Amino acid sequence: MASKPEKRVASSVFITLAPLRRDVAMAEEVRQAVCEARRGRPWEAPAPMKTPEAGLEGRPSPWTPPGRAAATVPAAPMQLSNGGCPPPPPVLDGEDALPDLDLFPPPPPPPPVLLPSEEEAPAPMGASLIADLEQLHLSPPLPPPPPQAPAERPSVQPSPLRPMEEELPPPPAERVEKGASTDICAFCHKTVSPRELAVEAMKRQYHAQCFTCRTCRRQLAGQSFYQKDGRPLCEPCYQDTLERCGKCGEVVRDHIIRALGQAFHPSCFTCVTCARCIGDESFALGSQNEVYCLDDFYRKFAPVCSICENPIIPRDGKDAFKIECMGRSFHENCYRCEDCRILLSVEPTDQGCYPLNNRLFCKPCHVKRSAAGCC
């Protein structure tokens, strides 16, 4: 088959042969090889096939004028070896449709193309192409693979649910190794083995033999103990560390009162005059560090005003000030001029006290008394 379409002239009708169609795409080299093989041999017309119209061959064909070729219309369109059909010839309306062409003699009529009978099977598509490939010692193209049915996915069936005990794996058994422990003895700073006796006290771990009194080394495991400064002590050693009362000399175990740099029982810290427990009240001391309540101390040691002859003590939560003049004591309100009763100042000013003959006078009164020469 030529690379370009081949044309044949039949009278004035041009028949164009279309190239063969291939169902399977070939490589460019195979196509060129087939074309060269076909150029070397003449065109092979398809073998005539029997048809029901074969009996009409003996009948004379209709008359045609000389110089013109009779156009033969085949009973069925010509089929190519690859199953294609050429395009139909143009239809002539009359004898004068085309001019007379006397250049070439009329070609012989084409052989009739008969339809294949039902008994004879049609030639397989591409038989001539396979024969050409066999001559060139080339392997024929592989037929297209048959369409495969979509693979069925295996049906996944949910497995029956099992109880929770079966799905969860059993917890791993805890292996306790010999001597493996994270507890450290707070006394010897060594590991506390699980097989050893241990004591937990003061938020710490101890070996049983290490938990002892820090003074006498007495075993305290299973015993009552006291804690002082983070150290365990037995009861006798703890009492030895306690303070003793400054009055009776006994150990102060419960409530303690600290005064004068000593410790006292609450019942021992009392007034020496009325024997009343002072507790957390204010107190006063005598010349020999005797403890007095305030009332007894003022009654015994408070100065007496030389004017009103009352003790000078604080009253109504207010402090009392003592004014001393000429060896005598006075209340602030009693420190006045004996003539004009004006309050005298404690400062050495004109408003101060100007005594005369052991009496209190202001400056003006003092001048008058001195000028008169009498008291």
From Swiss-Prot:
The UniProt record lists the keyword Signal: no
Q: Does the keyword Metal-binding apply?
A: yes
Under the heading InterPro entries, the entry gives: Znf_LIM (IPR001781)
Positions of region (FERMT2-binding): 278-375
Question: Which residue ranges have biased composition labelled Pro residues?
Answer: 104-114, 140-149
Which GO cellular component terms, listed alphabetically, does the Swiss-Prot or TrEMBL entry include?
cytoplasm; focal adhesion; stress fiber
Q: What ranges does the record give for the region Disordered, renumbered to this chain?
A: 43-119, 137-176
Filamin-binding as annotated region, ranges: 1-70
The protein's UniProt keywords, in alphabetical order, are: Cell adhesion, Cell junction, Cell shape, Cytoplasm, Cytoskeleton, LIM domain, Metal-binding, Repeat, Zinc
Q: Low complexity compositional bias: what residue ranges?
A: 150-159
Q: Where in the cell is it found?
A: Cell junction, Focal adhesion; Cytoplasm, Cytoskeleton, Stress fiber
For this chain's UniProt record, which GO biological process terms are given? cell-cell adhesion; regulation of cell shape; regulation of integrin activation
Q: Which GO terms describe its molecular function?
A: filamin binding; metal ion binding
Q: Please state every residue range assigned to the domain named LIM zinc-binding.
A: 183-244, 245-302, 303-372
The record's annotation in SMART domains points to: LIM (SM00132)
UniProt subunit comment: Interacts with FERMT2, FLNA, FLNB and FLNC. Interacts with NKX2-5.
Function as written in the Swiss-Prot or TrEMBL entry: Serves as an anchoring site for cell-ECM adhesion proteins and filamin-containing actin filaments. Is implicated in cell shape modulation (spreading) and motility. May participate in the regulation of filamin-mediated cross-linking and stabilization of actin filaments. May also regulate the assembly of filamin-containing signaling complexes that control actin assembly. Promotes dissociation of FLNA from ITGB3 and ITGB7. Promotes activation of integrins and regulates integrin-mediated cell-cell adhesion.
Q: Under which name does UniProt file this protein?
A: Filamin-binding LIM protein 1
Native organism: Pongo abelii (Sumatran orangutan)
Gene designation: FBLIM1
